[in-house]
């Protein structure tokens, strides 16, 4: 964080780091002392520079490394060493990409890259090509190169990502569309939702379940016996998931979550994050009284601190608040999906993963 302005500090994508590493490795492969810090051209035209963290020369190859700085974003790859190993390729073969240790291989259809390809996305490939072309043109050589991109300890780090579920095996993905990591950006999560839906559809799955968290995901999987690829890590972005499914349909969609998150959905919120959308306890009190709750209890609902407090009160007084929330959440979700040909339902679970309400929309 900037100590003067309080603004969150931006960082760099794995694609940007791989581009810098590839540039340095190519210069060293040509017998040139690499620039340090290493310049990289971003899609915007900006040219940041990166400290060279590693340079190894071997028989017929050079390996360079850049430490990823994700800024103030809680990125699992922050601090990881991104490596590029370069070798000369056969004449007229151009740039050939390979997955090094810690970078995964695509094994399932539905992703932007076909099965068998290293998980190096389109923009990072373009950025790497740009970096290598700059070096080649400056030195009067061609870009017939084998570029192996790796991430130190990437296979272990990948266990904390969605890669295995998406069919990316063996490590992390080299990502980025702008080259820059925006702290706490929604874009990366929503992109992973889209990729999860794409993979599930390519697998021929017809029933997908979007869950707000690990408890509801495990519960909905057990309830319906769903395969892992049918589970979409929706998080707070129910609106983003439904909008994408509207244009990329499946036969059935289930939305699963806890009582608090589903209360926000019932109130018309399509972004369920606590910092962006708060529960309207006045609305909840009116609902509580409309389904048989006592007036004095309604006053307690209005002044409640948490949704859990309201749920416990309703359970003690036998007021069917969870089914009422499920019905309202269904109406909101159906409006966002806007596809009568897609079966839609909502399931609400308690903190132990027990189903407390469900509704077909």
Curated annotation (Swiss-Prot):
Alphabetical GO biological process terms: anaerobic cobalamin biosynthetic process; methylation
Which chemical reaction does it catalyze?
Co-precorrin-5B + S-adenosyl-L-methionine = Co-precorrin-6A + S-adenosyl-L-homocysteine
Query: What InterPro entries is this protein classified in?
Result: CbiD (IPR002748), CbiD_sf (IPR036074)
A GO molecular-function term, please? cobalt-precorrin-5B C1-methyltransferase activity
Q: What class of enzyme is it?
A: transferase
Q: Which Gene3D superfamilies match?
A: CbiD-like (3.30.2110.10)
Sorted alphabetically, the keyword list is: Cobalamin biosynthesis, Methyltransferase, Plasmid, S-adenosyl-L-methionine, Transferase
Disulphide bridges: none
What does the sequence similarity comment in the record state about its family? Belongs to the CbiD family.
- Which HAMAP family does the entry mention? CbiD
Q: Which Pfam families match?
A: CbiD
- Tell me which NCBIfam families the record gives: cbiD, PRK00075.1-1
PANTHER family attached here?
COBALT-PRECORRIN-5B C(1)-METHYLTRANSFERASE (PTHR35863:SF1)
Listed name of the protein: Cobalt-precorrin-5B C(1)-methyltransferase
The EC number(s) attached to this protein equal 2.1.1.195
Which pathway does the protein contribute to?
Cofactor biosynthesis; adenosylcobalamin biosynthesis; cob(II)yrinate a,c-diamide from sirohydrochlorin (anaerobic route): step 6/10
């Amino acid at each position: 964080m900037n100590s003067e302005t309080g603004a969150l500090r931006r960082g760099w994508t794995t694609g940007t780091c791989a581009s810098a590493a590839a540039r340095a490795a190519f210069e060293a492969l040509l017998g040139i002392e690499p620039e340090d810090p290493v310049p990289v051209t971003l899609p915007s035209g900006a040219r940041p520079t990166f400290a060279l963290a590693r340079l190894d020369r071997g028989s017929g190859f050079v390996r360079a490394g850049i430490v990823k700085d994700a800024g103030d974003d809680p990125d699992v790859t922050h601090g990881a060493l991104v490596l590029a190993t370069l070798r000369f390729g056969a004449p007229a073969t151009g740039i050939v990409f390979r997955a090094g240790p810690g970078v995964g291989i695509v094994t399932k259809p539905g992703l932007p890259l076909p099965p068998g390809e290293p998980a190096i996305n389109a923009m990072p490939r373009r950025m790497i090509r740009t970096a290598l072309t700059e070096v080649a043109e400056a030195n009067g050589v061609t870009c017939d190169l084998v570029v192996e991109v790796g991430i130190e300890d990437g296979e272990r780090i990948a266990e904390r990502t969605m890669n295995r579920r998406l069919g990316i095996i063996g490590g992390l993905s080299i990502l980025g569309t702008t080259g820059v990591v925006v702290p706490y950006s929604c874009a990366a999560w929503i992109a992973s939702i889209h990729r999860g839906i794409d993979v599930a559809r390519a697998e021929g799955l017809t029933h997908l379940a979007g869950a707000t968290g690990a408890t509801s995901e495990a519960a909905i999987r057990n309830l319906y016996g769903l395969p892992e690829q049918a589970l979409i890590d929706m998080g707070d972005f129910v609106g983003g998931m439904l909008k994408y499914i509207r244009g990329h349909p499946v036969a059935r969609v289930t939305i699963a979550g806890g009582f608090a998150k589903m209360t926000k959905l019932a109130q018309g919120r399509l972004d369920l994050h606590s910092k962006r959308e708060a529960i309207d306890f006045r609305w909840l009190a009116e609902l509580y009284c409309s389904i048989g709750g006592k007036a004095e209890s309604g006053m307690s609902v209005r002044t409640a601190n948490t949704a859990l407090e309201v749920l416990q009160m309703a359970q003690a007084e036998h007021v069917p608040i969870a089914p009422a929330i499920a019905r309202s959440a269904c109406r909101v979700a159906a409006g966002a999906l806007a596809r009568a040909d897609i079966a839609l339902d909502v399931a609400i679970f308690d903190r132990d993963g027990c189903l407390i309400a469900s509704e077909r929309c």
